[in-house]
Amino acid sequence: MKRNLILSAALMCLMASAHADDPVQTDGDKYKVLLENDRVRVLAYTDQPGEKTRQHLHPAFVVYALGPFKRRLSLTDGRVLTREFKSGDVLYSNGEAHIGENIGTTPTQIIMVEVKESKP
């Protein structure tokens, strides 16, 4: 009985940590799932100047900027990137774990398409 309780607790911790890096879980107030299937997840993201995300992970993704914004990304390897977008800019990334911060004077408003592993 005690062994089953310990195993159940360990399994629950593993399941919680598996979702801990999901941006929808870490920053649900900023991300909204627009579509999800076995190949992609489409997200709308909005934040305000000065706001910061918790650390999270994206698989390979494409971002489309709905308006101009400026962000700082702190990557887990210690690098810090500054990215500035104009309305209509598009960016592809192989995926990364990061903390994002709006360092501009306008809201960040993007559509993000995360690419899931899939077989043709």
Where are these regions (language model features)?
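Cleaved targeting-peptide boundary
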Residues: 19-27
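A short glycine-rich, His/Asp/Glu-containing loop-to-beta-strand
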Residues: 27-52, 59-63, 113
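Histidine-centered metal-chelating micro-motifs
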Residues: 50-53, 91-101
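Hydrophobic h-region of N-terminal signal peptides that target proteins for export
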Residues: 11-18
